[in-house]
């Protein structure tokens, strides 16, 4: 429903208490209609916020059976709209599944925001075995050779800037996929005081350069 008001980070809302809520709101302010994902525990906090905080709209979850499918849908969306779509892939294993699709998007020069997750990076609070094998110190290195940019923010507030900057870079010609990796800990961090994170307009993509004159 286009008449429904879409909240943004600049709205005065008091009930956001987890880092994943702030991160989900950063996706909403980009006006992503969908986020394509294969569910995984590494971004359980963000998944919860997409459903229970945002109400599963703007973005709406598109559940995929494989990470390469999720990236392929985002590639097709970008081919039609010339705009980035959001994708979420689980930890190191999901990123490895997605990697061939990310490479295709890179070769096709299409914009895409890929959200990953890992951790907890703090080994003292990891669950036995499963969170050890799904944690990587430099997860972005797996696709760094065929993405425009990647980041691993250390706080929810930094994650907002990473998403804003990543979308700007993805949509700026020559377009390409970007990757933002979210530690489990910052997703589940309780937010006591909400900071003013500034205007998203400061991260607008520049106009395409003029073609060379003959």
Segments from the language model and where they lie:
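N-terminal alpha/beta PP-like core and its mobile active-site loop of ThDP/TPP-dependent enzymes
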Residues: 1-214
């Amino acid at each position: 429903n286009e008449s429904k008001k879409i909240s943004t980070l600049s709205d005065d809302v008091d009930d956001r208490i987890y880092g994943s809520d702030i991160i989900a709101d950063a996706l909403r302010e980009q006006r992503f209609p969908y986020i394509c994902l294969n569910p995984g525990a590494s971004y359980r906090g963000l998944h919860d916020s997409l459903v229970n905080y945002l109400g599963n709209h703007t973005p709406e979850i598109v559940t995929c059976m494989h990470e390469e499918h999720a990236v392929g849908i985002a590639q097709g969306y970008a081919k039609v709209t010339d705009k980035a779509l959001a994708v979420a892939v689980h930890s190191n294993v999901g990123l490895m599944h997605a990697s061939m699709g990310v490479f295709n998007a890179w070769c096709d020069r299409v914009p895409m925001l890929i959200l990953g997750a890992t951790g907890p990076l703090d080994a003292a609070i990891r669950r036995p075995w499963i969170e050890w094998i799904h944690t990587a110190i430099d997860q972005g290195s797996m696709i760094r050779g065929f993405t425009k940019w990647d980041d691993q923010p250390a706080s929810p507030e930094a994650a907002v800037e990473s998403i804003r900057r990543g979308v700007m870079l993805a949509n700026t010609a020559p377009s390409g996929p970007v990757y933002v990796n979210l530690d489990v800990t910052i997703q589940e961090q309780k937010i006591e005081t909400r900071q003013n994170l500034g205007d998203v307009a400061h991260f607008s993509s520049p106009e395409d350069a003029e073609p060379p004159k003959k």
